[in-house]
């Protein structure tokens, strides 16, 4: 029987997703130009999609159900989000030309993913504090985007992401979530390498 230790995949999965979320959030916070969407989607497919998918599948092997679920869902989010843009570009579906309508059809997408992120937050109560903060911020980010898109459609006064205050706020929440995710990944590598908590994660004490 092979007793060789299996590497911890949580580090690169968290870094990949956090980096992709950071780019998307910087775009929504109006730090990146709208023309950067191609870079964001390409990064999302590989760093935010493929990397967490590998981490999630490897977590199945180690018996870590929570990590497997979280990372595979993260990969699914980025694959789905990228194809929202790719399918019209490839001519496979009719593109939506009215910006407010395009935002409306994405509203349930972000809202439902926000529910999943909040469920992961609740499921992380026995994990470390950094992970809890990450999922909580992610849920708030997704819900703010959803409500911002709905408001844009309802008032019909937005033509771009830059016109939506809620989405701008969401962008900064997403920036925080992205940095927290990257911190979690880097801390996992560093702490495991040096066998001590160099970058604190806020471990939850075991319940009695």
PLM regions with names:
Residues 1-8, 21, 191-208:
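Extramembrane terminal tails and long inter-domain/linker segments of multi-pass membrane proteins
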Residues 106-122, 129-156, 162-187:
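Alpha-helical membrane segments in multi-pass integral membrane proteins
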